[in-house]
Amino acid sequence: MTNKINEDFIKQLNPQAKVLFQEYNIAFENKMWASVMILSLTIIDNILNDIDNLDYVDGLDINHFKSSKDFHWLRIRRNQILHFEKPIEGFFGNKDSDKTLKLDAVRADKTLKECFYILFRK
């Protein structure tokens, strides 16, 4: 799934985000679904907080992306994984857990691609 991201988008990433993106791809290829969700939001946060992006990313595009339903869902889902409060879907250890995590990882992948497209299109 992650192989279809335009290489031009990758060139826009700072060195830290590039390393995270490489690990993200490895996690996706190895079905490490929780890691995919965590890394996808980490990459997005890196992009949104990199002041060098202000030279070529439109502020309206940033606001549009930050107000998206998928971006908010990903932040909530990532926080549920990292900050345990109670058992959450995908972590019950039953036969549907892996399926749930995979579906969520695919949605996280879609959100990351959307971030690349919205912020780095020309």
Model-derived features: positions:
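Short, hydrophobic, well-ordered secondary-structure elements
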Residues: N25, N30-I51
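Charged alpha-helical initiation segments
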Residues: M1-M32
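A generic "cationic amphipathic patch" detector
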Residues: M37, N49, Y56, F91-N94
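Amphipathic, well-ordered alpha-helical segments in soluble domains
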Residues: Q16-L20, L39, N46, R77
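Short, charged/polar, low-complexity loop and linker segments
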Residues: Y24, D58-L60
